[in-house]
């Protein structure tokens, strides 16, 4: 299949998970979503990743974002592995894990990379907006665990810039100044950004984060 691109509608699917059968779009509802794959159950990096996500679920909820994991292992394997995650990561896994034994979802989302492995998924991440469109894609090799602080930062940026005519600069964090979109003329800035702004260059104008 063709590669999924930013702005594409995230493919819908039905799948078995550790929390029952879901229809993906229905499960998302009006929420944002993070779909992320891991190569295999009972592996070290994946164990730390899912433990971290479990601890971060409250932060995702603050952002109206649901998380769901996937690997090509079976349901019983997932359930047994969850016990290890809870024990070793001092957490309680509180989100569904898809059992994609037939690789249907992995194929749909192009998570199988033959140059890495044709049997296991790479570490893919898809951030999906409330409109069911793909907002972000990331792919990590099996050897490198993901940074979920960065994922939260990106969701903050995506949600902010979806509602205001701004963009977020390098290394931006929630609460810091943002840049005004180049399409906004100087004459409109006082009305749109009443907190004020700093004019650095005609194309580089900063303003305090508008929703803070």
Residue spans of the language-model regions?
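Chalcogenol-based redox active-site neighborhoods
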Residues: 1-212
